[in-house]
Amino acid sequence: MTNSPLIQFNIKKLIDIKMFGLDVSFTNSSIYMLLASTLALTYFYLAFYNRKLIPSRLQVSAEIVYNFVVDMLNQNIGIKGRKFIPLVFSLFIFILFCNLLGMTPYSFTATSHIIVTFTLALLIFLTVTIVGFIKHGMSFLTLFLPQGTPVWLAPLMIVIELFTYLAKPVSLSLRLAANMMAGHVLLKVIAGFTVSLMIYLKFLPIPLIVILIGFEIFVAILQAYIFTILSCMYLNDAINLH
């Protein structure tokens, strides 16, 4: 089991903490989530601390990321989505840094665990629900009955739409966790296989590993984007009642 590709996902307690009968121990997952947050804050602090008319490369890169998220909100929600920029931007950056941090050797990918991704998805789900009821009141419930639905079909459609709505945080969290775990497992397996091939082919298999790492970095960025854009679409449903 020492060579199992799943060992990299093991949760290890570093500081055992019990509060009110609950286990809130500080783990390797906690460290990497804290590290991802610290790196993100440091990056944007350095980028915007001393803003210049002629921006530095660091400032340009940070502005590109910020404008990317703002454009995502504008395209999916419109001007009404401006107030959600802090939430959506923080969500995207946190997932992105957790995903990329997990690509470093001997690190830990916090977003490969369903408890982490489900917590993020639940945050979006609760926000969408609360915003929907605040903005539309009980009319928000019309979201579960598409316009033009025949009366005889209405009960079935309400059940289906309600089930679909409740399944959103589950599918959102599973998609991110499953993709991050699958990618890391595949990379671990192929890397081990490549080491064996090097006995016979010398350094020829190394380009394969480089390509796979590049692809996994692309997937890490893509999954952060998918999670965020789906969150924007859910917010749009609540705000514009689609």
Swiss-Prot record:
Key word Lyase present: no
InterPro entries: ATP_synth_F0_asu, ATP_synth_F0_asu_AS, ATP_synth_F0_asu_bact/mt, F0_ATP_A_sf
One Pfam family of this chain: ATP-synt_A
Location(s), subcellular: Cell inner membrane
Sequence intervals crossing the membrane: 29-49, 84-104, 114-134, 140-160, 181-201, 203-223
Principal cellular location given in the protein's record: membrane
UniProt GO MF annotations: proton-transporting ATP synthase activity, rotational mechanism
GO cellular component, one term: proton-transporting ATP synthase complex
Keyword Transmembrane helix carried by entry: yes
The entry's keywords: ATP synthesis, Cell inner membrane, Cell membrane, CF(0), Hydrogen ion transport, Ion transport, Membrane, Transmembrane, Transmembrane helix, Transport
CDD domains: ATP-synt_Fo_a_6
Membrane topology category: Multi-pass membrane protein
HAMAP family: ATP_synth_a_bact (MF_01393)
Subunit structure and binding partners: F-type ATPases have 2 components, CF(1) - the catalytic core - and CF(0) - the membrane proton channel. CF(1) has five subunits: alpha(3), beta(3), gamma(1), delta(1), epsilon(1). CF(0) has three main subunits: a(1), b(2) and c(9-12). The alpha and beta chains form an alternating ring which encloses part of the gamma chain. CF(1) is attached to CF(0) by a central stalk formed by the gamma and epsilon chains, while a peripheral stalk is formed by the delta and b chains.
Recorded family membership: Belongs to the ATPase A chain family.
Function: Key component of the proton channel; it plays a direct role in the translocation of protons across the membrane.
Stated name of the protein: ATP synthase subunit a
